[in-house]
């Protein structure tokens, strides 16, 4: 929006040429998103508290959660999305179809999450919408987004699957690209959703993954860097770095209020939207496996739930004291802050490994 206006004035005012630089606009998007969240965060929390938009606590969860977290507002994802939209709409190139694809995914999943949060608040329980309705809705949204992407995309690499550590190992998925992409988006969305169970636990890993993909999208969209790193060059992909910058800024601003002890939770509004957007970014940058590495904490949380459910149905026994796995460690006696910080450390290590795969080929 503002970027488009400024670009038209570059010929008259040469100093405005700096706004054409992706790195500069990524930084602007990040700081804009962060500033918006910090600016409206406190009145937002007060408004939600007054309106009793509070987070329902699981009855079967750790006992201290009932004491510590009851009365904390939820749907903080609205804050994140307002910040994210501010950054990308002001500083992003809105003629880039990748941006519109990502905006569709993040807004649609955010709306679904908001509806889920609304149901939880209205009926004062942690169930929300049914699992079947949520999954079907997520699949439909992802399908519409992928079909739209395939229609408008000029990217000949779109259906290719690349593997980290291998230079020439490429598989063309053909039409299987569609269900594969749906799986990535839906899986990523739910994995972040499952991780968001402790104060700040999901926020920092999202920042780290978005930071990794800001770099990945930048080098993927640069013909010189992509050739040097032997990764596919994707024209226009650099603009995704601006979107990632908006995610980072919005989450940094939100972390100010979400750090232990949290003054607000992101709820499904934030977790579904952020997870879906990370999955979508992994797909369009053609780094799906790197997404699984950098977002390995999300994968671990999701797998712990799947394993727990399968084990209980087949044997009647639970492998973990409670799933997702962060609650398992709480049940073992770890304090919430210990779990959160150690999981952040794991995320930092995984982010470094993920970035290292770009060079180790």
Predicted regions and their residues:
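Alpha-helical transmembrane segments
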Residues: 2-43, 82-111, 151-152, 157-161, ...
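Membrane-interface helix-loop junction between the first two transmembrane segments
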Residues: 42-60
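Juxtamembrane helix-capping/reentrant segments at transmembrane boundaries
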Residues: 57-72, 126-137, 326, 331
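Alpha-helical transmembrane segments and immediately membrane-proximal extracytoplasmic
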Residues: 57-74, 98, 214, 224-228
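Select subsegments of transmembrane alpha-helices in polytopic membrane proteins
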Residues: 69-81, 133-141, 336-346
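Membrane-interfacial loop-to-helix junctions in multi-pass inner-membrane proteins
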Residues: 95-103, 122-137
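Mid-bilayer segments of alpha-helical transmembrane spans in multi-pass integral membrane proteins
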Residues: 109-115, 139-151
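Membrane interface segments of multi-pass transport proteins and intramembrane proteases
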Residues: 120-130, 163-171
């Amino acid at each position: 929006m503002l970027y488009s206006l400024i670009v038209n004035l570059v010929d008259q005012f040469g100093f405005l040429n700096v706004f054409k630089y992706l790195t500069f606009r990524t930084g602007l998007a990040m700081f804009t998103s962060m500033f918006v969240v910090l600016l409206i965060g406190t009145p937002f929390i007060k408004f939600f508290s007054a309106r009793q938009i509070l987070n329902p606590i699981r009855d079967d969860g750790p006992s201290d959660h009932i004491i510590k977290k009851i009365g904390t507002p939820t749907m903080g994802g609205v804050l994140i999305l307002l910040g994210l939209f501010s950054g990308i709409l002001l500083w992003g190139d809105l003629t880039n179809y990748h941006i519109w694809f990502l905006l569709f995914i993040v807004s649609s999943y955010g709306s679904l999450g908001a509806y889920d949060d609304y149901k939880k608040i209205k009926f004062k329980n942690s169930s929300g919408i049914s699992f079947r309705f949520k999954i079907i809705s997520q699949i439909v949204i992802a399908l519409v987004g992928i079909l739209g992407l395939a229609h408008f995309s000029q990217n000949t690499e779109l259906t290719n699957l690349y593997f980290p550590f291998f230079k020439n190992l490429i598989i063309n998925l053909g039409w299987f690209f569609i269900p594969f992409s749906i799986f990535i988006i839906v899986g990523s969305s739910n994995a972040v959703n499952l991780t968001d169970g402790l104060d700040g636990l999901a926020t920092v890993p999202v920042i780290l993954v978005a930071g990794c993909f800001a770099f990945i999208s930048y080098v993927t969209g640069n013909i010189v860097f992509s050739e040097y790193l032997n990764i596919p060059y994707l024209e226009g992909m650099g603009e995704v770095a601006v979107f990632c910058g908006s995610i980072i800024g919005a989450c940094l601003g939100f972390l100010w209020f979400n750090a232990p002890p949290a003054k607000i939770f992101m709820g499904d509004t934030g977790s579904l939207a952020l997870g879906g957007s990370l999955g979508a970014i992994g797909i369009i940058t053609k780094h799906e496996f790197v997404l699984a590495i950098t977002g390995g904490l999300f994968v671990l949380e999701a797998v712990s739930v799947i394993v727990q459910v399968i084990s209980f149905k087949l044997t009647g026994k639970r492998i973990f004291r409670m799933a997702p796995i962060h609650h398992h460690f709480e049940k073992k006696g770890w304090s919430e802050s210990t779990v959160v910080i150690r999981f952040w450390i794991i995320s930092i290590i995984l982010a470094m490994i993920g970035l290292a795969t770009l060079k180790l080929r």
